[in-house]
Amino acid sequence: MDSFQDTDHAELDRLVEGQLRAEHDGDVEAIVGSMAQAVVHDLVGSIDNPVHGLAAVRRRYHDVLAATVHERDVPVRRLYGPDFVLDEHIWSGRLIGRAFDLDGHGRRISHRAVWLLEVRDGRIVRETVWNDIESIRRQLG
């Protein structure tokens, strides 16, 4: 079993805010810059899940950011543990390509997103993301 050190809330907040800002800016290198070399990325509901390692996560984010324009996040709640943060927010933007098995055609969408970031030594070792796909389907339907 891995031994984790307590990570303070301010450090966890910096990680979450940095990830959100990097996604908003479309900056893949900033996104993966806070991740461990052996990071695991689990996009719940995705066919190719989970992906392992920085190269695979980098490719996934290139694909996601090519299909979406991240415009705004509205915080809902954030929960903390000694080695994780759970962040719930409302994601708003445009789906300009194909994502979640849906074609967006540039339409605006807004949905609930829940992120679980597991952290060791100040780096994200696992990121699990739940997007409210049914809400997205209803908006695009």
What is each PLM-predicted segment?
Residues 1-37, 140-141:
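Short, low-complexity N-terminal intrinsically disordered segments enriched in polar/charged residues
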Residues 13-14, 28-82:
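A solvent-exposed, acidic/Ser-Thr-rich amphipathic alpha-helical stretch
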Residues 83-95:
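A short hydrophobic beta-strand element
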